[in-house]
Structures are given as structure tokens and as C-alpha cells.
Amino acid sequence: LALYFLLDNNLITNKTEINQYFNIMINEVSLDQEIKNLIIYKKGLYNSNTANEQELLSIFQPLISSDNLWRSHSLYVIAEYYYSKNEKNKSKEFFEKILNLEKPNSQIKIEAQKRLQRDFSD
């Protein structure tokens, strides 16, 4: 919670330092796995506007490669990242991955379906 207070109030603005704090919370603090997954997701969101493709995929990799609460959310962020970079095929691939999940977040699934119908229908 302290990290989010620091971020929300712009008390730390150095991206490298902020990412180090995220890494400490993920790797060194004893937390429930789903809480760690939430922190990974928030780290991905924090970096999504400035990270390059490999950095973003690396951050989200633990979430998109395992069954967890944040998997569909992470796939959606990556799909939107590619969409914003005009990489439509990659974007479509990640939106479709959401639809193929066994238990995606229902709202994320609806948003992915809308995006596919609106922007990728032939």
C-alpha cells in the first residue's frame, strides 16, 4: 500500500526506482500468490505507456503463462498495446487468446469480443 501511496502522490517519479520497488514486493516480500500476481499486473500497467514490446511481454509473462485471476486482464493490456502501435495482427491474436481462455474475466471477454467485432471483422 505504501508504494501506491508514493505513486499516487508523485512522491517517487524515477521509473527505475519505482520498478525496483515493484520487484522487491514481487520477489522478496512474503505475500499470497494472487496478491503477487496483482502487483505484477500493476507493474505492467505502470510500464505500459513507456515500455517497449519485449519489456512489456517480460513483465506480463508470469501472468499470461499461468492460470490466475489476472491472465485475461494482462492479455487485454498487451492486445491494446499492440493496437496502439498499429500492430493489428498481434493485437487480434491477444484478443483471441482471451476468448479461448477457460475462465476469462467476463467483462474483459465482452470487451475483447467487442473489439474483435468492431475492428477486426472481415
Which residues fall in each region the model found?
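Soluble extracytoplasmic domains of inner/organellar membrane proteins
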Residues: 8-14, 19-122
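Short extracytoplasmic
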Residues: 1-2
